[in-house]
Design a protein with these regions (language model features):
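Phosphate-ester processing/binding pockets and catalytic centers
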Residues: 2-71, 76-353
């Protein structure tokens, strides 16, 4: 931690207030069915409320500036055997205000020399990509209005939908077969429902009646074929009413397009590098201790960036983990920068909440 420099510029504060949700109802779960909802749903609500109780929760106003479409871009990390955590990252943003970001990213791609290379955590070892990360993250902070939310789940927890026994697996299998999705490995079914319930919760929290909802997920085991992906959207359409009765005008989605459409991939990449960096960092801390943790080159830029919200882009990371007494608990995760950046200014959180 270090002493922060605050600004009280009225124009900046007003700009921040326009794109920030000033009165958010964090009681997302409905009284009628909250007892029937899975543990994950309760952990999500508890996590957001815990962040709010700390006075640190900032949420985006996704209907500001006449935005009519909520874009959700999701990617996941921690699936390698060495990782001790699964991570699920979701960029929930004002889709209608992204044109300036797309224009600036096209320019950055040309200047940085990465051309048509996808920005991905697994490729941080490539010098040109690693060197352009700070500029990319600054553009995200400046031109994306939304929330980057990451859920971290301890791998010792087999399921967030039951005790993880045969009965839990059977219920998930039956639910998938009812939709025509087909049979999948239990780990894929668990992942699928974790992702869909997170999206439903976030849409219930941040979406407004009449808006369109567009979701893009990376090529992944939960939607390997176009037909599977279509059925995946159908399952989301069934899960969403468990969390909200808001009438949305459209619910659709896509996998990454062919040929590559970087105006979408550059948004998906933000979820990719957040999920990858957080999984790798927390695993290293858990294994070696905080002082000896080894952060992947490039990951240091992402961690530093995750420490603070920008005027338009908010960030929130929470965990569901095994407690020392064997129970499962949840709560926010804080990343704290140790050194300042030149010309760095902060708006007091209480002025925009």
């Amino acid at each position: 931690m270090y002493p922060k420099r605050f600004t009280f510029d009225a124009r900046l504060i007003e700009r921040a207030r326009v794109v920030t949700l000033l009165s958010s109802d964090l009681n997302v779960l409905c009284d009628e069915n909250r007892a029937e909802l899975p543990g994950l749903a309760h952990f999500l609500e508890q996590g957001f409320k815990a962040r709010d109780a700390e006075g640190k929760l900032l949420l985006p106003n996704l209907s500001a500036l006449a935005n009519r479409t909520v874009g959700i871009f999701s990617d996941y990390g921690g699936e390698d055997s060495a990782s001790r955590f699964f991570t699920y990252s979701f960029l929930v943003c004002a889709f209608g205000s992204l044109d300036p970001f797309k224009q600036q990213m096209a320019t950055l791609r040309d200047k940085s020399g990465i051309g048509r290379k996808e920005i991905a955590f697994k490729d941080f070892r490539w010098g040109p990509l690693r060197r352009m990360l700070p500029a990319y993250l600054r553009l995200c902070d400046s031109y994306i209005s939304g929330l980057l939310f990451t859920l971290v789940v301890d791998k010792t927890i087999p399921s967030l939908f039951g005790p993880g026994d045969a009965e839990t697996t059977r219920r998930m299998t039956d639910a998938l077969e009812e939709t025509g999705y087909g049979s999948v490995a239990p780990r894929v079914g668990e992942k699928l429902f974790r992702i869909l319930h997170c999206i439903a919760f976030l849409v219930a929290l941040l979406g407004q009646p009449g808006q369109k909802i567009f979701w893009m997920t990376d090529h992944d085991a939960i939607g390997e074929t176009p037909e599977q992906h279509r059925k995946l959207l159908g399952i989301l359409n069934r899960v969403l009413p468990l969390y909200t009765n808001k009438p949305f005008s459209f619910l659709g989605g896509a996998r990454p397009f062919t040929p590559r459409a970087f105006e979408y991939l550059d948004l998906l990449s933000l979820a990719d590098i957040a999920a990858g960096t957080i999984a790798q960092t927390l695993t290293s801390i858990d294994t070696l201790g905080e002082e000896n943790a080894q952060i992947k080159d490039g990951g240091d830029h992402v961690l530093r960036w995750l420490c603070h919200n920008s005027i338009t882009l908010k960030k929130f990371v929470m965990t569901v983990k095994r407690l020392p007494n064997g129970e499962v608990g949840c709560g926010p995760i804080d990343f704290e920068a140790r050194t300042p950046i030149a010309d760095e200014l902060f708006i007091p959180t209480q002025l925009v909440r």
